[in-house]
Amino acid sequence: LGCLLGALDELVRGVDVSKIERVVLSTTLITNMIAEKKTDPVALVLIPGPGTNPRDYNLGPSIILDGAIDFRGKEIDWLNESQIKEAAARIKESGVSRVAVVGKFSQRNPAHEEKVSQIMSQILPGSKIELGHRVSGHLNFPRRAATTKLTLATKESYARFALAISRALEERRITAPVYILKADGGTLPLEGSLQMPVETIFSGPAASIMGVMALTPPGQTSVVVDIGGTTTDLALILSGSPLLSSKGARVDSMLTHVRAFAVRSVAIGGDSAVDVAEDCLTVGPQRNGSPFCLGGTGPTPTDALRVLGRSSVGDLERAKEAMAGVASRMNCTAEKAAEMVLDSVVEKIASQVNEMFREWEQEPAYRIWEIMKKEKLEAQNVVGVGGAAPALVPLIASRLKVASIVPEHAAVANAIGAAVARPTITLNLHIDTERGEYVTAEDGIMGKVNEKQMSLAQAEQLARRLLVERAGRLGIEEYAAEALVTSSEVFNMIRGWSTVGKLLDVRMEIPAGLLSSWRCT
C-alpha cells in the first residue's frame, strides 16, 4: 500500500485533484495473499448429495453433511440436525471463526444452506458464515465451493485494503469515483467489490491486456507477452477481443467461477536467478532479489541485457562483473555468457507460447472464432509490455517467426489498461416455468414467474431488468444500456405427451472494452 500511495503522490503533484474524473486500481493483493498462504482460515462445510466423492475435489479439509437437492431444486434427501450441531461443535473447538457452507444445486434451492447457517450461527455466535448460492449461482459444485471458500478467506483483508485506499484518497482531497480492475478486464466500483474480492485476482495481467488493446491497432490477433521481474504472463487477443478462460480462473490449483482471461504465467523474468551447475546454465524459476547491476547479489537476465547493450538499466560495470562470474564457470567470455542467458529466456518464453496455443485451441471461444473466420489461428504479432519488453520481445517474435510490436508507453501498459478499462458485469438467468421460479447465477437472486409458456423474448426482457438492477447495486447503472444478449435458449419439458413447462437460460453482459473517449498525453 505504501508503494501505491507513493506513486499516487507523484502522479498528483502539481495537479488540480478536483479535475480527476476516476481512479482505477489494479492490485495483486488477493493474488499475493493466496500465493503466500496468508489467507484467513475457513471451515468448509459441504452438502454434496449423491455422486462424486467430495474428497476428490482438491478443496482441502472439509466437513461433509447429509442432505441433497436435485438439479431442479427439489429436496431428495433430508438434513441431519444432530450432524450439523456436531459439525458446528468441531468448528468451535478448532477456533476457526469463518465458515463456508456450500450445497450442490443450492442455486436452485438454497433451503439446506440457509438451515445449516441458522443452526451453526446459534452454536458459533460471532462467526462469519458465507453461503455458496450467494457467492455464485453458476452450475459446477466444486468451483462454487472453491469460490465461496476463497471469498470468505480474503474478504476481511480486502476490506481493510479498500478502507485504507478510501481514507488515503480522502486525505488527498480526491473525490473521484474509485474502481478496481477485475480478472475479466472490466472495472467495478471499489465499494461494490467488497462482496467479491476474489474477482480482483489476476487483475495485473488483465490490466496489461487492456493496455495492449489501447496501444495497438484495433482488430488485431496478437499474443501478449508481459515481462515482469519474476514472471512473464502470456495471453491472446483474437481479432481485438481477449480470450476468456471457459473454466474460470485457476487459483491455487482450484478452478473457480471467477471470469478471467486465459492467461499463463511463466516463472521467468528480468530478475530471475541465473545459475550454472555441471556446465549447464539455468535461468529461474527462483528469484534472489534485485539484479546485480541494481545492487543485488547474483546475476540475472537484466544484467545480461545491460552487458549486451540492449538495456540502460543499472550499473554497466556491475553487470559485467555478474556475467564474468557466469562466464568463468562456462569457460567463455562475459558477452557470450550474456547471449546464452538471453537465449535461454527467449527459448523458454517462446516454447510456452507454443504450448499455450495448444491449450487455447481447446477453448470454446477460440473454436467459435475459428469457425466464424474460417481460418486457423495464426498470431499476427507478439506484443510486448513491461520494462524488459523492448529488449526481449523482438527476439521472442523472431523465434516464433511473427512480427514484433513494442508500443509506445509499453513500460506502463498495465497502468494505461487499468485507466481506460470500462465497467463490465455479466448476468446469467435460469427460469423454470413449471416451478414458477428464476435464479441469477452471479449472486443467487431468486424470484417467481407466473408465465408457464414464457417466450425467449420475455425471458430476455426479465434478464435485462435484472441486469439493470444489479448494475445499480454495483454503482454502474449508466453502462447498463450497453448490455448485450450473448446467448439464449429454451427447452420444453414434456410429461404425458404434453408440455408442462419450459427451462429458459439467458446470458447478458456489459462486455469488457475501453472507455469511448480517452487519450495518452
Language model features with spans:
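N-terminally biased helix-coil "hinge/interface" segments that flank
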Residues: 1-521
